[in-house]
């Protein structure tokens, strides 16, 4: 009667593997001078001390954890007078291990620099990290081009509007929570109550844009695509 128990053990291990594979690591780059600790690692939102972050940044971290990643590494960006110091921020994250990256604090120009960075990391160093950025048609498997705007969500019982840049943290957390048996396509985003809907979802998807759609009942990821189109 030992064989069934062996099968059960294999099953348990398989379930454990799927659970582990579904829990990737997200790196969030945030502009925040509330505290001085640069690199902060959390395994659940309860680990985060609210007073260590601005209210907006705490909400961004909270949104990320909605996707159930294994860990969220929050890095305080090195700033300069007119934004962040991209080169120094890249040095900060260079040796950190993560699967998904989001940086709501980036300008479009800074986002383009990070898109180029992640693309080159993928090509030259074969690193697996991918970036979720807004309005970055990078044509790269290492960059997700998030392209939905006017996002309204229910958060802590209130309806609020979220900038697409801030919502990249939610998308990164969701992507980190997709296991090897699943796809991010049609993943439901239960907190959303309104968006600016795409006029032509098929064209947007073909153009390498990750968008949110409304199917008449639920808001969900249209298709889990990167910005790669060639």
Q: Which residues make up each language-model segment?
A:
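A glycine- and small-residue-enriched flexible loop/hinge signal that marks low-structured segments
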Residues: 88-230
């Amino acid at each position: 009667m030992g064989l069934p128990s062996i099968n059960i053990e294999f099953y348990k291990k398989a379930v454990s593997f799927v659970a582990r594979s579904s829990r990737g690591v997200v790196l969030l780059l945030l502009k925040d001078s509330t505290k001085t600790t640069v690199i902060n690692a959390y395994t659940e939102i309860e680990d985060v001390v609210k007073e260590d972050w601005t209210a907006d940044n705490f909400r961004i971290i909270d949104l990320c954890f909605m996707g159930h990643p294994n860990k969220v590494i929050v890095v305080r960006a090195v700033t300069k007078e007119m934004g962040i110091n991209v080169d120094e921020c890249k040095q900060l994250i260079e040796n950190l291990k993560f699967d998904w990256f989001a940086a709501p604090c980036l300008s479009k120009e800074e986002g383009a620099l990070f898109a180029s960075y992640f693309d080159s990391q993928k090509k030259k160093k074969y690193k697996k990290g991918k970036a979720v950025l807004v309005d970055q048609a990078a044509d790269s498997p290492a960059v997700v081009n998030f392209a939905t705007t006017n996002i309204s969500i229910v958060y802590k019982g209130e309806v609020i509007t979220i900038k697409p840049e801030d919502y990249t943290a939610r998308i990164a957390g969701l992507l980190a929570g997709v296991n090897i048996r699943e796809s991010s396509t049609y993943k439901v985003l239960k907190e959303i109550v309104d968006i600016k809907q795409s006029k032509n979802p098929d064209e947007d998807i073909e153009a390498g844009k990750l968008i949110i759609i409304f199917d008449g009942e639920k808001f969900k990821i249209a298709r889990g695509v990167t910005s790669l189109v060639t």
